[in-house]
């Protein structure tokens, strides 16, 4: 085999170990898709001892099954997500998470640990959309949305209509991280939970020095 052929094989072998997050976060580690719980929304709330993490799939089997929702409390997001693996037979896969929803209390304490988790975790993606729930907890909102369809379906509908809404702009974890690195300030779409259990746009959460300091109308 020519030298170039060997180089291609070596690159193929070592790229998954190189930390190329953007390229390989979609690979499900050779597991069968049927044996995996593909989480699409992650919610993080503040507790007295650390955080509560709520993970939800979308609606399943073309609407025939409600979303699967898992919840764990731990001292860190990574510990809570790891504990979820013991809740069922399916492997909990976070590589399909498209939305990260933060409760207001957690956001006021600081959003940086949640963003750092996304940045460092091998499955999570930097293009994940970021939201702050105004006046409530992310986990409760995810549970309420599941009574209608799922948080994933509702947020994806808002994201698709973002160009048509004057009070809603998509923001990714990567974009907010870049803002914080450059000037310490940023803004994140705010949501409220409507009476019908639907997530609704509520302007923007204003972030200063990595923490929620107030709200702005869209």
Model-assigned labels for residue ranges:
Residues 2-10, 14-218:
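Membrane-proximal alpha-helical signals and transmembrane carboxylates
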């Amino acid at each position: 085999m020519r030298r170039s052929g060997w180089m291609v094989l070596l690159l193929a072998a070592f790229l998954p170990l190189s930390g190329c997050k953007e390229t390989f976060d979609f690979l499900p580690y050779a597991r069968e898709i049927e044996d995996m719980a593909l989480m699409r929304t992650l919610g993080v709330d503040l507790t007295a001892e650390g955080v509560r993490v709520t993970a939800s799939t979308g609606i399943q089997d073309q609407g025939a099954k409600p979303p699967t929702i898992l919840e764990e409390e731990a001292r860190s997001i990574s510990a809570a997500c790891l504990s979820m693996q013991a809740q069922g037979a399916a492997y909990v896969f976070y590589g399909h998470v498209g939305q990260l929803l933060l409760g207001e209390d957690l956001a006021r304490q600081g959003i940086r640990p949640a963003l750092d988790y996304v940045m460092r975790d091998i499955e999570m993606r930097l293009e994940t959309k970021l939201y702050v729930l105004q006046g409530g907890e992310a986990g409760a909102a995810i549970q309420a949305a599941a009574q209608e369809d799922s948080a994933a379906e509702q947020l994806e509908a808002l994201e698709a209509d973002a160009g048509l809404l004057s009070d809603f702009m998509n923001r990714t974890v990567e974009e907010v991280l870049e803002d914080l690195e450059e000037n310490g300030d940023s803004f994140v779409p705010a949501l409220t939970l409507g009476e019908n259990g639907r997530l609704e746009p509520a302007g923007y959460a204003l972030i200063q020095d990595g923490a929620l300091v107030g709200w702005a109308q869209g």
